[in-house]
Structures are given as C-alpha cells and as structure tokens.
C-alpha cells in the first residue's frame, strides 16, 4: 500500500518496467499473453524435472576429475523461468497523483492501460474529482470500461462516461456501467460492504500466502541521459 503520491509515481514507473520485462520473456518463448506463458512454463517445468532426475541418476556415485565435473555441470538441464503472477494496481484517488506527477503519471498510466493487460497487469483507477485535468482525454481513451456513481452535474457525467445520466442517479451504490467495446450504459447497484466484511476479506487473502514486498519498486529510475526521473521533474525556480 502506497500513500505518498510521489512514491506512487515511482511505483507506476516500476510497473511499466515490469510490463516491458514480461513482454521480453513472452517474446523469448513465443507466446502472446501471460496465460500462454504460464501454460508453457508448466510444461517446461515438468520436462526440466524429468531431465534433472535423469541427469542426477547418470551422475550418481561417480568419482571424476574436476575437468570432467565441470563439463557435466555444463550438461545440467537449465531451469525454466518461474510462472508470472497477475498484478492488480488500484489507484484510489487519481487527482492526488496527477497534482504531484501529472506528466509522468499520465504517461505511465497510458502505457499500462494500452499494453499491460496481456502481460497480466490490470488497473483500477478511481477519483472523486472527475474534471478534465484529472481524467484527461488520453487516459479516458485507454480505459474502455468505466463506472460512475452519482455526480453533481452533467459535465461530470460526460467527463466520465461521455454521456449524461450519472447526475440523476440515486446514490448509495446506484451506478452506471459502461462495458468494454460498447457505449451502451447499464444501470447496476453496488453491494454495501461493511468494515467488518472488509477485514474478513483481507484476512482470507492473507491466509493464502505471506506477502512478498519488493523494495526496488521505490528506487529512483535512471533515464538514458543519466538523470533520474525525479531530477527531470524538478524545477529549481518553482520548487
């Protein structure tokens, strides 16, 4: 969980790098998406374990010189990459991120929205201030699926859905949903989830596996020019 908007921008930059690395891995094994990659890794893992057992059996209880041992080590089967996990990125308030890092944040969001789905990285973006400087045209164009709760004006409704109607909703979970691939709006109702239920869900998720934290997510990335991204955004006269 990232609460500092500046660190959130760094986390988005990490997500872009992770997406690019995943595409390189998928390109090497000749698959188009994360599903194909994980299926192929399962197959290669089974083949690797069979080859490893055969290799260990062939070299068991044998006394050989260092030179022969080094040659046999080179014949040892190569372990395939691990399967790729799915990543869900949830931005609770886009307005805060856009105020702190509008340029870098918009670029990262756009790239992730355009390409990240096939690599197993998905985005949920929310805001309580649906203005055009927060939900820019570039961001909206790359988020085909949208939801709007009750808003105060027609302008806000058009900003989110490109259509009026959200200003007439009843509130308390009443919403309009735009499915991907269509501009037809569906009126649906969200479920009320209490704090107690949220804690139960979190506890259930924690029971599945212990969290693995990656400290490198917040490391300052270095650009091709040798400057850090943070330094590029720094304006001496303004700051």
Locations of regions flagged by a protein language model:
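Conserved nucleotide-sensing/catalytic segment adjacent to the nucleotide-binding pocket
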Residues: 2-16
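P-loop NTPase motor-domain active sites and their immediate coupling elements
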Residues: 13, 17-239
């Amino acid at each position: 969980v990232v609460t500092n908007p500046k660190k959130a921008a760094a986390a988005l930059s990490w997500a872009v790098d992770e997406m690019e690395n995943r595409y390189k891995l998928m390109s090497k094994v000749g698959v188009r998406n994360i599903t194909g990659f994980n299926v192929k890794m399962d197959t290669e893992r089974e083949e690797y374990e069979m080859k490893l057992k055969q290799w260990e059996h062939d070299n068991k209880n044998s006394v050989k010189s260092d030179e022969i041992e080094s040659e046999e080590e080179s014949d040892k089967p190569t372990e395939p990459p691990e399967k790729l996990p799915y990543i869900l990125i949830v931005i609770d308030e886009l307005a805060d991120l856009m105020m702190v890092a509008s340029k870098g944040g918009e670029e990262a969001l756009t790239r992730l929205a355009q390409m990240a789905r096939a690599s197993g990285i998905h985005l949920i973006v929310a805001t309580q201030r649906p203005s055009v400087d927060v939900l820019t045209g570039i961001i909206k164009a790359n988020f085909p699926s949208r939801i709007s709760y009750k808003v105060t004006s027609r302008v806000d409704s058009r900003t989110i859905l490109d259509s009026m109607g959200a200003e007439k909703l009843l509130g308390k979970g009443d919403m309009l949903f735009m499915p991907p691939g269509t501009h037809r709006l569906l009126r649906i109702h969200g479920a009320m989830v209490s704090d107690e239920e949220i804690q139960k869900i979190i506890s259930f998720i924690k029971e599945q596996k212990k969290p693995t934290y990656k400290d490198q997510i917040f490391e300052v990335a270095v650009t091709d020019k040798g400057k850090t991204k943070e330094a590029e955004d720094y304006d001496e006269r303004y700051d």
